[in-house]
Amino acid sequence: MNTWASKDHRIKIYQNKTNIGPVLNWNECFKHASGEYIKILWSDDWMALDFIERAVNLIDEKSAFVISNHKIVSENGIVDNVKYKKQKYTRKEYLYNILFQNIEKFPLSPGCALFRTKDLNDNFVIDIPNTDGLDSKKNGAGNDLLIFLNIVLNYAHISILQYDGSFFRAHKESFSIQNQLELYYEWAKVYFIQKKLNKTYYSNIKKIMFWQQINKGNKIYHNLYVCLKYNYWMPLSFCIIILGGVLNSLRNRK
């Protein structure tokens, strides 16, 4: 790396004095970056050679960030091939997907995205409050998602490179595979909704998380519900949906 840095002044080599963990290390990287844009690339993943060029050409003043179609690849071949239907998704379309069912399969990891350096420095969250004793600074789960969520609020849409520009490697040593990270991400969503969104979004997420608890039949989300202070009032139509789900769950358990 030092050899490359000696050939091009734009390449910077930086080493922390101690091991500060992934999240604080990301923050140091963002602060040391001097370019207009940042492309994050984790050690397990790779990108197409022309990804940055194409992403920079696509981003505009109304775009929060640029992501591409991406593949998840294992030693046995392609695990998932995510292709997006449109070149642009509105802020509302993006938020409803990423916060709720995520039918479009928007990524949690920023490894397939191009961001403005200023946006990353202005919106990066280091500590995610929770009552489950989770420390996301140790793994970055939730901190990565909040990059997308916080930035998109300031723009009209996200932009999509409709080609396979990013590749995530899935293997048994992968941190995201070895660890159960779902609860970290749900706390990140709750933090974002409580801090940033209006009552409509806030109400919807409470209903959906309440439904998740019933449907999954476990108490993993208990502290989340306490945090949300669910008031047990719901529209009749949603109550009927939940009742139907409960009945189906009971039938399936017989």
Language model features: what each stretch is:
Residues 42-46, 69:
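The conserved acidic donor/metal-binding loop of glycosyltransferases
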